[in-house]
A protein has these predicted regions:
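Membrane-anchoring hydrophobic helices of lipid-metabolizing enzymes
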Residues: 1-42, 68, 86-87, 147-151, ...
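A cross-family acyltransferase "interaction/gating" segment
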Residues: 16, 108-164
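Catalytic core of membrane glycerolipid acyltransferases/transacylases, capturing the structured
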Residues: 24-77, 120, 133-136
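Short, charged beta->alpha transition segments
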Residues: 59, 79-87
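Generic beta-sheet signal
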Residues: 73, 98, 126-129
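Catalytic-site beta-strand/loop segments enriched in glycine and acidic/polar residues
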Residues: 85-120
């Protein structure tokens, strides 16, 4: 039932890309923007690594229903789980990951995305999201939940991130 309600919410959002998505690429986003990015990049042949936590299980089920190729992993296991994303990039598909990982600190990039982009010689895209109307959760990452019929603007930058990672 929750997945059905979430899918209806996603369908109500008006999503606009400031510029086209380059593929294949490592798509780096902030954990706070996961709900909007999940909706924005649906059915675009993207592989994602999702935590094995309980929250990750719920998120993985929704992501799979939106056309994502899901791999479950743990940040405590290091890069062993990233091999699936590596293979996806080598085969010409994109890989998405939260730059600040599953536990944060929020908005502090970890090295995994940069490593993956360097090893596969694919661009690392920094995704920033703007919302017309959204709630913010009281969680470690202050997740944005766009309200019904919110306008979501996806900003794709492949220059800035290279300068600070």
């Amino acid at each position: 039932v929750l997945n059905f309600i979430l899918k209806l919410l996603v369908l109500s959002w008006r999503i606009h890309f400031e510029k086209p998505l380059i593929q294949p690429a490592v798509i780096g986003l902030w954990h706070q923007d996961l709900p909007a990015c999940l909706a924005a990049f649906k059915y675009k042949n993207i592989a994602v690594l999702i935590s094995q936590s309980g929250d990750g299980s719920k998120f993985a089920k929704l992501a799979k229903s939106l056309g994502y190729d899901i791999f479950r992993g743990s940040s405590s296991k290091g890069q062993s789980e990233v091999k699936h994303l590596f293979k996806a990039l080598i085969s010409g598909r994109s890989a998405g990951m939260a730059l600040d990982g599953p536990r944060g600190p929020a908005l502090i990039a970890k090295p995994g995305a940069r490593w993956l982009a360097d090893k596969t010689e694919t661009p690392l895209l920094n995704i920033t999201v703007k919302y017309s109307h959204a709630l913010r959760l009281n969680s470690w990452d202050k997740t944005f939940i766009p309200l019904p019929f919110a306008k979501i603007t996806i900003l794709i930058n492949n220059e800035t991130l290279d300068n600070w990672l």
